[in-house]
Amino acid sequence: MTDSHAALLEALGVALPAELLTIALTHRSYSYENGGLPTNERLEFLGDAVLGLTITEELYHRHPDRAEGDLAKLRASIVNTQALADVGRGLTDEGLGAHLFLGKGEENSGGADKSSILADGVESLLGAIYLEHGLTVVREVILRLFGELLDTAPTLGAGLDWKSSLQELTAARGLGAPAYVVTSTGPDHDKEFSATVVIGEAEYGHGVGRTKKEAELKAAASAYKTLDES
């Protein structure tokens, strides 16, 4: 295990076997270029479920008076590609991207800082921690890594539904309905979407996500904050 991997495990606060950690950090692009090595996709699948359960349970207990719909929106503001990627960027001084095994093409195109890849990497690490240590330990890791998001999500207000809130704000100011211009990059199996909010003829916000919907929500959030502060 390298010193950089030791730093990553220190940031996570757990120990993992070298083989399991390697799988958790192996992106499919690296596997394709190196004879079909095991990738982190199965661990990502597992980690996604563990993360969703942990955040859902925590929100359920923290907010006993909130309706199911509000809890779902709170969870969506925490468990999404951008939030996961930001958590990944905060792991070690270099960020998670520096520890991932990426194919040369992906690495040369900036894959180490691509939100979708970082988000998948965080989930795969959580899956590995669950396999090695069980639910109690991975829950502790998740609550530490996502603690700030759990604390701030209820204070976002409009953030529970950025697109609707933006539309209400632009209508109140007589600016007309916001439009969303969406583009995508990357292969079909690993697309990243970019959305820009246009109101009138001016651009007000930009967002990136693993899906078109997520990119639009991020762009709406950015546009809302820009307008709200002007």
Curated annotation (Swiss-Prot):
Enzyme class: hydrolase
Cofactor: Mg(2+)
UniProt entry keywords in alphabetical sequence: Cytoplasm, Endonuclease, Hydrolase, Magnesium, Metal-binding, mRNA processing, Nuclease, RNA-binding, rRNA processing, rRNA-binding, tRNA processing
Residue positions binding Mg(2+): E44, D120, E123
SMART domains associated with the record: DSRM, RIBOc
Enzyme Commission numbers on file: 3.1.26.3
First and last residue of the signal peptide: none
GO process annotations (BP): mRNA processing; regulation of gene expression; rRNA processing; tRNA processing
Xref: InterPro entries: dsRBD_dom, RNase_III, RNase_III_dom, RNase_III_sf
Domain DRBM per the UniProt entry, residue ranges: 161-229
GO MF annotations in UniProt: double-stranded RNA binding; metal ion binding; ribonuclease III activity; rRNA binding
Residue span, RNase III domain: 19-134
Active site positions: D48
Compartment(s) of residence: Cytoplasm
Catalytic activity: Endonucleolytic cleavage to 5'-phosphomonoester
Database matches in Pfam families: dsrm, Ribonucleas_3_3
Gene3D superfamilies for the chain: 3.30.160.20, Ribonuclease III domain (1.10.1520.10)
Family: Belongs to the ribonuclease III family.
UniProt xrefs under PANTHER family: RIBONUCLEASE 3 (PTHR11207:SF0), RIBONUCLEASE III (PTHR11207)
Function field: Digests double-stranded RNA. Involved in the processing of primary rRNA transcript to yield the immediate precursors to the all rRNAs (23S, 16S and 5S). Processes some mRNAs, and tRNAs when they are encoded in the rRNA operon. Processes pre-crRNA and tracrRNA of type II CRISPR loci if present in the organism.
Quaternary structure note: Homodimer.
Designated name of the protein: Ribonuclease 3
